[in-house]
């Protein structure tokens, strides 16, 4: 019997109370009884001596009754099995506690487990014997069931931990492909750009994504020099001209030129070639043609296909240029355009030449000068026609109006115009394609709306001093007897009326074709009958090219001398060269499809929701413009990259939801077209390398993908860690210093796309293996979350135990219920005869001994 019980048989101490409560619990159990019919408070883990004394005081009446019951109890045949089962459950509980503490890493419990929640001395056993329990005695208790699960779970946890560590160590040095990085670089000279125009006033350009013109942002990024939009000026001009005239109808042949090209021996031996040049005639409407030709339409050029414009002056990135007034034909008055007068320095034939050297007159020191000159024109009715009755308002009643006969060949739309300044023009200059006789000038004229006439614009040509001899070329100057030249006065004096006419056609060379555009019908539809006037509408920023004229000392033959000391060049403005000059400030850049960076980028990449494909808008505009311009290092850019993704994702979702609610069809049209266009553009980027990136393990929503080690080792894609410097380098510097690395990855993509035999075979094997074990690659991510959760819960429980003593009793009860804590029940026996038998019961049945023999 315990020492405390022997000292005072009336007062029941903690040790005797513990055994009495064990007996009380054991009597409630059967062979297949519940695992935990009750909890012995004296066996709660961590109970103190003071708490045991308090329990004794509270439970003293109950304990006295249990002691009396034990003295009267009869040891029945079934009691031995109950005691053996209680003892088995006690040790099974200790096993479960060991597994749980092993699971949470509390290994010191394994060393001190016999001191926790048990008597200071265990049940006395004279000689340790091997205990054996039948399966009926063990049964399938909750402890056994959960113990097996806990053991399997613990083993699986550590197995996954080892696998995860192995995978992490195996991929720690992997290299990562950063898809669509926040970076812009110059395009190559050989790259093809796709562009279109946007002009709100012109239907020919309204089919483009007009809203893209507003997608721009300032940046302090410095981009390496590369091709500008001016490199494609000729192609852009040709396309714009076709857009301006695309609604023109082709009619009959306007002119046919027959020429003979002789061979090196003349026409001997049939070496002559007869060439016939056919100039077709196109009928056009003035409102769709003339405004474009004179640069009256504000046109923005926008890039597609992932290309972006970088304004070298304003440091802005945008999809479109600022609105430009682009004249499509040669003009005397035009925007500021640099021209060269020294022919020895002219390499590009499209650059306008500012002087001539085949005359004695030598034009040099050409300069562009702005001007405020105005041309005023008025028309007086003088053509044959008929009086027609016109219906007027009720006040004026009906009246008769004069309508000229436009179908008559004698009908000619003539005007009288004057200039506000004296204009002296240079020697010879061509007008369109085909010589214009006499002194001449062309300009645009605007007519305001009135009661009898609508608002309109016309192209007017004024000619004076037209020579009678068509074989001679009218040349500005006063020198007589010049071979092949007819001297004319090319000065247009201020406030002097000159005979002018509406220009009803013009000839242009587009690409390799010469075309004549007939606008006779367009002129008729603008109601030119009657008396009206117009004023030139030259933009205030336009001017002309003024050159100094000096006479050379050459006197070999009679040549035309300078009429004045200065001369204005007619049709000096070259539309292609002018367009090139306007577009030189726009550098064409692109966002790389991918950037190879070290694997450590994945360490400081925040966990965020994957973005949808239309969030490429943020990558191509907001991020590339604002983010890349901060000059931040690669480490900071990764975080900012995902912040922009998340922010823009939320913005797009909110805008789309608002549009659905309000059902603003007209307002949302441009937005929908913009989003569709950007989706297509982003999909093109993904589809271009879709197969290759998929084989590398990247899906369409992933922006960081690891390159398989066998690939970057095979292609020797070694990253210079010194240059990377743990991410303390800007992405622009990294791209410039690792171009060879990016090129090698491009070779990998191309090899995969071209179904390289070796790569294809390896990828097939990799695909078969990945179908089975592909989920292993995500284990480290899962383990991080699982391990972090377990550690967090463990630390939280530990803090509660240490910092909240008032909740200790509640926590004990909860732990006992969760762990299924069970105690043993051993009754006290007073007779010596029964002592031996009880020792057998306490020790359990020996192997090979029946219950009756044991009793």
From Swiss-Prot:
Q: Which UniProt keywords apply?
A: Cleavage on pair of basic residues, Coiled coil, Disulfide bond, Glycoprotein, Host cell membrane, Host membrane, Host-virus interaction, Membrane, Transmembrane, Transmembrane helix, Viral attachment to host cell, Viral envelope protein, Virion, Virus entry into host cell
Q: Which InterPro entries is this protein grouped with?
A: Envelope_glycop_lentivirus, GP41-like
> Which positions are glycosylated?
220, 258, 269, 274, 298, 336, 418, 422, 448, 469, 481, 499, 518, 531, 548, 551, 716, 720, 728, 736
Membrane-spanning residues: 785-805
- The ranges of region (Fusion peptide) come to 615-635
Residue ranges of coiled coil: 642-692, 735-771
| Site-annotated residues for Cleavage | 610-611
One annotated Gene Ontology cellular component of this protein: virion membrane
Give the span(s) annotated as Immunosuppression: 661-679
- Identify the residue ranges that face the Cytoplasmic compartment according to the record: 806-855
For this chain, one GO molecular function annotation is: structural molecule activity
Question: Topological domains (Extracellular): residue ranges?
Answer: 1-784
Q: Give the record's PTM text.
A: Specific enzymatic cleavages in vivo yield mature proteins. Envelope glycoproteins are synthesized as an inactive precursor that is N-glycosylated and processed likely by host cell furin or by a furin-like protease in the Golgi to yield the mature SU and TM proteins. The cleavage site between SU and TM requires the minimal sequence [KR]-X-[KR]-R.
GO biological process per UniProt: symbiont entry into host cell; virion attachment to host cell
What exactly does this protein do? The surface protein (SU) attaches the virus to the host cell by binding to its receptor. This interaction triggers the refolding of the transmembrane protein (TM) and is thought to activate its fusogenic potential by unmasking its fusion peptide. Fusion occurs at the host cell plasma membrane.
How is the subunit organization of this protein annotated in UniProt?
The mature envelope protein (Env) consists of a trimer of SU-TM heterodimers attached by noncovalent interactions or by a labile interchain disulfide bond.
Protein's name according to its UniProt entry:
Envelope glycoprotein gp150
User: What is the organism of origin for this protein?
Assistant: Feline immunodeficiency virus (strain UK8)
